[in-house]
Amino acid sequence: MSNRDITLAYQNVRGLNTKTHEFYKAVSSCDYDVVAITETWIQDGVCDSELFGDSYIVYRRDRDLNALNVSKGGGVLIGVKQNLISNKIDLSNLVTQLPAVDVVGCRMVINGKTIYLFVIYIQPN
């Protein structure tokens, strides 16, 4: 990849379950390199391809609703364009210790430099 700027979009979507088609169209119509989302409210029933197609690698952390005894909420994700080098950061120890904190992280190599991106959502009390 040649040296260039990257574009990043962030949004708190407050639930994607009923907005997957609109979200997919919005992401498809833009050319962001990285998309960071909080409050996805999604679970295993929603596939990454419903949100991003095949042009992004998706790293996500869905909220464990059973562990927190809630019916919805939380969740974070990062979508990284396929042409960027990236991999998920293992945060399983942190997630175990802080189940009410939704966090996902990835490591990217951009223009020869390593960048770490974390998306964190802490629900208000």
Residue ranges of model-derived segments:
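A shared catalytic/ligand-binding motif for oxyanion handling
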Residues: 1-125
